[in-house]
């Protein structure tokens, strides 16, 4: 059975935890393992933080959009902003690369997303924003409920 959820919220750092918890609560119906749930929460946190800090440059202007589709123990996650976009996507995907060293960012966001998810694709255009598509196949064990 297919189930979908869409949320939109203002690009404020205090909304990052709301996004993480909301997505985790929605995904919980598939009974993921604790590791799977933690990985998805971490990925949501990284993507939303990137949208807020880099996409909107921490301005509080604009929205972050999250779409989650659950189907046959697969999580399809899309996180989108309408911010400044990523000028050099290849460079941005390199471990330790950051455009905000003054904020003590580690530059590991995309690396974490790539390691925790089964598939990731990123679409970005200058001044048009960024869309990240992520896919995770969940195990069929019921470890979370045991």
UniProtKB/Swiss-Prot annotation:
EC number: 2.7.11.1
Protein origin, superkingdom: Bacteria
Record keyword Hydrolase present: no
The keyword Nucleotide-binding is annotated on this UniProt entry: yes
Keyword annotations of the record: ATP-binding, Kinase, Nucleotide-binding, Serine/threonine-protein kinase, Sporulation, Transferase
Assigned protein family: Belongs to the anti-sigma-factor family.
Protein purpose: Binds to sigma F and blocks its ability to form an RNA polymerase holoenzyme (E-sigma F). Phosphorylates SpoIIAA on a serine residue. This phosphorylation may enable SpoIIAA to act as an anti-anti-sigma factor that counteracts SpoIIAB and thus releases sigma F from inhibition.
Name listed for the protein in its UniProt record: Anti-sigma F factor
Species per Swiss-Prot/TrEMBL record: Bacillus licheniformis
